[in-house]
Amino acid sequence: MNDQYVQKTSKDGYRSRSAYKLVEMDNKFKLFQEGQKIIDLGASPGGWSQVASQKGANVVALDIKPMNAINGVEFIQCDIINEFEILREKFKDQKFDVILSDMAPESCGLKSLDHIRIMLLCEAALNFAKHFLSHGGTFVVKIFQGESDKDFCNELKKMFKTVKYFKPKSSRSESTEMYLVSLGFIGSKPSI
């Protein structure tokens, strides 16, 4: 494949090209500081967890799919929707400085349906953040542009001081993929 980011992944030691998306977001928004506690939702194969841990963060990676170990990263294979109560018990009253979500559904090829499916994952990630994100924390979530992303963005604006759309250069130009970077968590009532 003639993709500069795919070629760079092996040279730079990243597990996926998506690592460069997070590097770009960190360069622009200064997401990470050493010693932060971070949750990486939809972590497998681990590119985002690698980036966050290299910045000196304490990372807990969650994914329904398996993931090979990364030094300094705790991995929990789980379904954040169907196993939420187990996770709530595990993390109890813990709070995290940053919650990242690069979750995406398996594409069916129908953009409108893929959009609906990713927005359901976005809502699940946001519910997770409502429970576990610390006051002033950061939430980054992948979306596909479509009918309801603006409503979701407006929902975030009620809970965060700053919310920005971001399309990384390392994202494929033909993709409807974007990220919402939400800074300064003010708080909200969890839905569960």
From Swiss-Prot:
The active site is at K142. Gene3D superfamilies: Vaccinia Virus protein VP39. It comes from the Bacteria. Its main location: cytoplasm. It catalyses: uridine(2552) in 23S rRNA + S-adenosyl-L-methionine = 2'-O-methyluridine(2552) in 23S rRNA + S-adenosyl-L-homocysteine + H(+). Its EC number is 2.1.1.166. S-adenosyl-L-methionine binds at G46, W48, D63, D79, D102. It is found in: Cytoplasm. One of its GO terms (cellular component) is cytoplasm. Specifically methylates the uridine in position 2552 of 23S rRNA at the 2'-O position of the ribose in the fully assembled 50S ribosomal subunit. This is Ribosomal RNA large subunit methyltransferase E.
